[in-house]
């Protein structure tokens, strides 16, 4: 081992060098790679942030800035975590809804859904999808004169136009039941315009009114000359349908197209309020009332357009905008009556005039772009409308304008109907009337604007209202002394009784009027607010306030006591009014005042039933109040919360005592027994016990009691002659003692035990047994000092000791043993133990002694732990449970833990395997 380092230190050093070299190179490579990667990532993300900042700088207008997150992505075009401002987003109303499968229901947020019907066979579902229209700026305007080339694309008719003639928020072209086309004639979803430019059901135009005369309608379906459009509204020759696109002769009376269109439910839009889902009758009635509205002036529409284009934040969703078609109605081949055609043509002819003047012209390129984006299938051709109107989807700012609110009414047969504001036309009821003024502008709702609320002025003077009603037991009413109380005549039920009967009622029931609460169910009498509470006369109020308080509850009341209590209560009331320490308060019936003012003597004690009430009522002298004893019980609580004096209580009649040993009970100047404190009474007699020292003869007891045989009289009324607080000693008379002794003899009570002879001095040592005898310690053993003290005790203590010691009779008397060994001079050791304890004889013998282990085998005993405090209170087992034969050296040690347990249960060593 000593040569290991000398032999291998070169290889060990080279290994350390190579390991350190490659470790350094690897760490350097990893560090450089990470640094370059992070640097490249930072540069790329910085370029992306710069590009975004440039784009946002171009898009920002005025205050439309947003504080986006500058976090960057890992690559160039994977994703961007920065949020896009809402102002730069496209209007969601311009997007078409996603296509739905047949029998699929579109989930709506307006608590109703539109059921979808299967599409017509022959048109694939993929061909029904439509791209969203290309948004253009607000400065671009649709072109009214449109070339035929704009209506055709690859030999097929474009979709101008029947749907674009409609305005408002209606997405689907839903025909009324009587005017709907069969599935072969229905409009393709690609020809439908976005939801912000279509017409609600009440403004829809049936296809029968949109067909030119070249479509071979019957004469009844043709438009009469009086209902045709004005020259400015009619379609130019270039907009007419070519002959090849007209309806074949076999379709006379039922206009149709050369292709089959799916049902309008194939293209579902956002929800529409239920009010727009109207049957055909309502739509027809609304169409008849369309003539009541006239067109808005051109200058006003231009001003509204400028206001709407300057607004950067779009309005919130208008629930009145019709974004979806009404619930679909089964398509029927039903010809249209002539009356309906005339009515719809009348409402139709007034629409395009404002649109032409307001929107101006639009280049043909925009129309072609829209037609190309709609992706109409090649075999499809469109039903040409009779009138072509400009597409209204190119004006998104007009969507914010409140619809149908700027058109004043006009005569029913007016030539033009007002074109409502672009986007979100509400459903017009048949009886709807628009405001007459045409200069109304709607201010958009700004949630951040601070709204000032007008203060509401109370029309009722609160100061003149009476106080509200309160519960009668809620509390006492406190009023200043100067303010008069309201008369109880309007508050108390007693007020309905006349004054004479009311006074008699008070005397009989002893219930004062002022004890009834001041506020008691005020809504019953609160009828006139003009009359105040203070307008009642003061004479009646003073009469009620001067009534005496109620007396204490007496179960047996006489008329004399009532008169006396009323007189004394009136005196106490006058004394309280003179003091004026606090304002008077009305008492509450059935309540107890927890904080009374205690400035009067305690009430009298309860009394027994009246035996002779006339004798005490004639006493002219009032008894003096007794001084309360320190040992007596506390006074009873007051039964009333009002202030009373001791004189206000009537003196209860006393019961004449039938005891002949108390002659002073007949004295009328002395208060009755019920009014005296309990502590003044003598204690009850103690149970009789004979004195054992005087038990041989009762003559001494009888002689000593002759002097006290005379009855003792007590003057309870005189406080100077007797100390009431001192306990009164009472000795029973001799007759009572003799009578009780005779009763005890008759009952068979044992005679007293005979006089016990004096105990010998060494009697207690007889029971002392040698500790080695029977292998146990006697319980009654005592030391020598205890024996000496025991000899000095009295005879009673010796008797008590003998009663607790159970001795077994051995046939040897104690006197014989004393005479045998010479009386009291016998020593303790000379007397053999003739007596043993009974309990000892019944116990089994102790187990044999275990031999002591050798010190060499026996290990050192473990250290004895300190004695715990909680073990001191543990009672020790009886001496018989201890094993005293094994090593009794440590028995007297207080800290020895084996005193509390059996030594056999505790091993003496930790390891038992060494035995």
Curated annotation (Swiss-Prot):
Places the protein is found? Membrane raft
What are the alphabetically sorted keywords of the record? Answer: Membrane
Q: Residue spans with biased composition (Pro residues)?
A: 405-414
ATP-binding among keywords: no
Amino-acid biosynthesis keyword on record = no
Q: What is its main location?
A: membrane
Q: Where is the composition biased (Acidic residues)?
A: 64-77
User: Could you tell me which InterPro entries the record lists for this protein?
Assistant: Aim3
Q: Which GO terms describe its cellular component?
A: actin cortical patch; membrane raft
Low complexity: which segments have biased composition? 140-152, 162-249, 283-295, 383-404, 654-663, 783-793
Task: State the annotated membrane topology for this chain.
Answer: Peripheral membrane protein
Q: Where is the composition biased (Basic and acidic residues)?
A: 470-482, 556-566, 736-746, 831-842
Q: Which portions of the sequence form the region Disordered?
A: 30-915
Which cystines does this chain contain? none
- The UniProt regions of compositional bias labelled Polar residues, in chain numbering, are 103-114, 253-269, 296-373, 426-440, 502-534, 696-716
GO annotations under biological process? barbed-end actin filament capping
Indicate the family of this protein: Belongs to the AIM3 family.
Q: Under which name does UniProt file this protein? A: Altered inheritance of mitochondria protein 3
Source organism: Vanderwaltozyma polyspora (strain ATCC 22028 / DSM 70294 / BCRC 21397 / CBS 2163 / NBRC 10782 / NRRL Y-8283 / UCD 57-17)
């Amino acid at each position: 081992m000593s040569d290991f380092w000398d032999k291998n230190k070169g290889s060990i050093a080279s290994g350390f060098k190579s390991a350190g070299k490659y470790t350094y190179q690897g760490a350097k490579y990893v560090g450089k790679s990470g640094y370059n990667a992070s640097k490249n990532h930072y540069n790329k993300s910085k370029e992306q942030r710069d590009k975004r900042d440039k784009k946002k700088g171009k898009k920002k207008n005025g205050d439309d800035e947003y504080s986006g997150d500058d976090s960057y992505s890992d690559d160039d075009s994977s994703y961007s975590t920065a949020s896009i401002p809402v102002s730069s987003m496209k209007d969601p109303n311009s997007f078409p809804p996603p296509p739905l499968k047949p029998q699929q229901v579109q989930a709506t947020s307006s608590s109703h859904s539109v059921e979808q019907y299967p599409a017509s066979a022959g048109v694939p579902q993929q061909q029904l999808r439509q791209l969203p229209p290309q948004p253009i700026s607000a400065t671009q305007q649709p072109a009214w004169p449109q070339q035929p080339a704009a209506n055709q694309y690859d030999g097929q008719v474009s979709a101008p136009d029947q749907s674009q003639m409609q305005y408002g928020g209606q997405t689907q072209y839903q025909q009324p039941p009587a005017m709907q086309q069969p599935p072969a004639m229905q409009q393709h979803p690609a020809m439908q315009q976005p939801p912000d430019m279509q017409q609600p059901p009440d403004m829809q135009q049936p296809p029968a009114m949109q067909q030119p005369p070249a479509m071979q309608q019957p004469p009844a379906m043709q438009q009469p000359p009086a209902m045709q459009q004005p020259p400015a509204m009619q379609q130019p020759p270039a907009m007419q349908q070519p002959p090849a696109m007209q309806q074949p002769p076999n379709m006379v009376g039922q206009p149709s197209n050369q292709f089959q269109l799916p049902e309008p439910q194939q293209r579902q839009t956002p929800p529409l309020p239920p009010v727009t889902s109207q049957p055909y009758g309502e739509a027809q009635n609304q169409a008849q009332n369309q003539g009541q509205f006239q067109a808005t002036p051109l200058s006003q529409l231009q001003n509204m357009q400028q206001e709407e284009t300057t607004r950067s934040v779009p309005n919130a969703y208008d629930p009145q905008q019709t974004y979806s078609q009404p619930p679909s109605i089964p398509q029927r081949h039903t010809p249209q009556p002539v009356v309906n055609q005339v009515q719809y043509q009348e409402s139709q002819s007034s629409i395009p005039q404002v649109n032409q003047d307001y929107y101006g012209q639009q280049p043909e390129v925009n129309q072609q772009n829209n037609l190309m984006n709609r992706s109409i299938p090649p075999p499809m051709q469109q039903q040409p409308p009779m009138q072509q109107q400009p597409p209204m989807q190119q004006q998104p700012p007009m969507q914010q304008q409140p619809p149908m609110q700027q058109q004043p009414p006009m005569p029913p047969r007016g030539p033009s109907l007002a074109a409502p504001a672009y986007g979100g036309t509400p459903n017009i009821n048949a009886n709807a009337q628009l405001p007459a003024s045409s200069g109304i502008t709607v201010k958009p709702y700004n949630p951040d604007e601070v709204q000032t609320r007008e203060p509401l002025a109370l029309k009722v003077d609160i100061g003149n209202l009476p106080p509200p009603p309160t519960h009668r037991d809620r509390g006492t009413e406190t009023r200043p002394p100067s303010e008069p109380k309201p008369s109880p005549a309007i508050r108390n039920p007693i007020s309905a009784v006349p004054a004479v009967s009311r006074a008699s009622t008070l005397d009989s029931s002893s219930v004062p009027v002022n004890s009834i609460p001041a506020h008691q169910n005020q809504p019953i009498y609160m009828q006139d607010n003009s009359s105040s509470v203070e307008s009642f006369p003061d004479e009646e109020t003073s009469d009620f306030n001067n009534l005496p308080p109620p007396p204490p509850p007496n179960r047996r009341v006489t008329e004399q006591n009532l008169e006396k209590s009323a007189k004394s209560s009136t005196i106490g009331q006058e004394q309280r009014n003179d003091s004026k320490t606090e304002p008077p308060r009305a008492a509450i019936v059935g309540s107890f005042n927890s904080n009374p003012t205690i400035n009067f003597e305690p009430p009298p004690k309860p009394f027994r039933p009246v035996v002779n009430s006339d004798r005490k009522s004639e006493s002219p002298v009032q008894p003096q109040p007794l001084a309360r004893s320190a040992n007596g019980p506390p006074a009873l609580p007051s039964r009333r919360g009002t202030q009373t004096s001791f004189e206000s209580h009537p003196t209860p009649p006393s019961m004449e005592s039938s005891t002949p040993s108390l002659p002073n009970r007949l004295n009328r100047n002395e208060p009755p027994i019920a009014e005296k404190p309990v502590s003044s009474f003598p204690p009850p007699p103690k149970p009789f016990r004979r004195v054992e020292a005087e038990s041989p003869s009762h003559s001494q007891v009888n002689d000593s009691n002759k002097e006290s045989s005379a009855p003792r009289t007590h003057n309870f009324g005189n406080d100077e002659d007797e100390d009431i607080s001192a306990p009164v000693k009472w000795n029973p008379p001799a007759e009572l003692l003799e009578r009780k002794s005779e009763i005890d003899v008759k009952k068979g009570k044992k005679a007293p035990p005979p006089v016990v002879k004096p105990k010998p001095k060494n009697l207690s040592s007889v029971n002392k047994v040698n500790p080695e005898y029977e292998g146990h310690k006697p319980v009654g053993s005592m030391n020598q000092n205890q024996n000496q003290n025991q000899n000095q005790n009295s005879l009673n203590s010796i008797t008590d000791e003998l009663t607790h010691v159970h001795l077994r009779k051995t046939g040897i008397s104690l006197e014989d043993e004393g005479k045998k060994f010479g009386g009291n001079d016998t020593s303790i050791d000379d007397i053999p133990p003739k007596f043993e304890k009974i309990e000892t004889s019944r116990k089994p013998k102790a187990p044999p002694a275990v031999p002591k282990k050798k010190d060499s085998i026996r290990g050192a005993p473990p250290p004895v732990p300190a004695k715990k405090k909680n073990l001191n209170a543990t009672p020790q087992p009886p001496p018989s449970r201890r094993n005293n034969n094994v090593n009794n050296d440590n028995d007297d040690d207080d800290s020895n833990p084996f005193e509390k347990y059996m030594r056999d249960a505790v091993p003496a060593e930790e390891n038992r395997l060494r035995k």
